[in-house]
Amino acid sequence: MKWLLAALLAAFFVYLMYDTFAEKPILVRRKRLCDYTASGSVYEDIPTAIKRGIRLLEVHVYSDERDQPVVSMVPQNSGWDFTDDNVSFEQVCVDIVNDAFPSKDPFILSIVSHTDKSVTINKVAEHLLTTLRRHMTYEKNIQTAPLDSFANKLILISGGNIHGTALEPLLNLSWSDAGVRRLSYQQALHPRDPSELARFTKDHIVIVAPQPELKTLTANPNTPLAFGCQWNLFARDPPGFVLKSSRA
């Protein structure tokens, strides 16, 4: 009788172990944000871009005749401070909240301002807070934070003439700071110091932007990856976050 009881207890223990390990898969946490590359989109229909899976979007913001922020859908010549082919920044926020979430990944929004009107940039901040507040995180300098800590979150990056506006404190990353660089494709393709750029991308973020005026949209988009540049706005890679070492 004792051996039967022992056998039953052993069987019950095996069942518990199976239930613990087989039915509940072990979660593997991903590495740091700066350890992943992401292909992105710019000057593209935003709902279409998001629905095909991109997690990196850059918008070029201008001020309309009412000082409202609008996003250009076509590249403008350098120095222009207006755009005719545009959508409202408010609509961009609505598209993001409707189509980009929920997700296990963050959504990166890069904002390039082409206006010096603080009232317009303050409106950008207002629309973000009104529409996307529950997905926002106010952490700063997040390059080395775990990617999984930003699941279902919006990561904001910008720079330049947003200093002193309501948008500035909402940013997680800024290419005006030392830990982030925004390079043109030509700058990433022909860095002045390739070794220094490769070292920089070990713990920092580089975002690579296309140069339509130099017709680089059709160039090999993956070349900057050789130096570790993470965020490529016109790469042809599959959407999502890809571990850099897996590209070797």
Give the residues covered by each predicted segment.
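Long, acidic (Asp/Glu-rich), low-complexity accessory segments flanking structured domains
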Residues: 1-56, 63-248
